[in-house]
Amino acid sequence: NTGHWDVKRVPDSFSKSLENQPLQDTSFSFTDVPNNNAIIDDVEMKKACISMVKDFYDEGIDLDYADGGLKCRCEIASYFYDGVKKNMGIDAELSFETKPTHQLGGYNPLTNKIELNSNYLEKSDCEDLLNTILHESRHAFQNKCIDTPNSVTVKDNIIEVWKDNFDNYIRPDEDFEAYENQEIEKDANYFADSVMKKGTNPYYA
């Protein structure tokens, strides 16, 4: 994937949004999601996200996405994010926005919003979209860890590194190699890639 995700640095903002409209009920739901007030165990949360991806494909929702129109695809993406959001104990707002092709999405810790490139909705294959939702949601989770460290099991020294990275964020247009090597980007990339890889592996248990 040659595109990049963007985490906005203060006072910038990550971007993303599509018209907010009521979403219709869909035929699928995500189960066994933890309460947002509970302490989020990082390992168990990841397992829950893997199970969610597995269910998504096992139930053929990827095929529903491919066959659906833009509104249907937006609804499926939003409901997938709703499951991720509950698993992670985050409350970031999700929206789609017109962006250059190379900008996949972004998270803005100031507004607590995740913005995705609306170009995703034009593609019938939703794998990259799900990966980006997981990636940007992980940034929102990192921010949650910084704001409320007692609500997660992530170690304090890791949270300190993330906080420093958020405060001194390097944008991809400044230094792409340095951008990719930032701890919050490496963590979000690894999280999203591993969840998708295991969730789509029929032999993963």
Regions found by a protein language model. Name each.
Residues 151-205:
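Metalloprotease/metallohydrolase-associated module, dominated by Zn2+-dependent proteases
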Residues 55-110:
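Auxiliary, metal-adjacent structural segments of Zn-dependent hydrolase domains
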Residues 115-132:
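Short pre-active-site segment immediately N-terminal to the catalytic Zn-binding motif
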Residues 136-154:
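Catalytic Zn2+-binding segment of zinc metalloproteases
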Residues 68-77, 126, 130, 180, ...:
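Hydrophobic (often cysteine-bearing) scaffold residues that line and stabilize catalytic clefts
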Residues 64, 86-90, 147-149, 197-205:
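Surface-exposed helix-capping loop/turn segments at secondary-structure junctions
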Residues 1-70, 202-205:
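Low-complexity, glycine/serine/proline-rich disordered segments
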Residues 5, 112-114:
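Hydrophobic residues embedded in beta-strands of well-ordered beta-sheets
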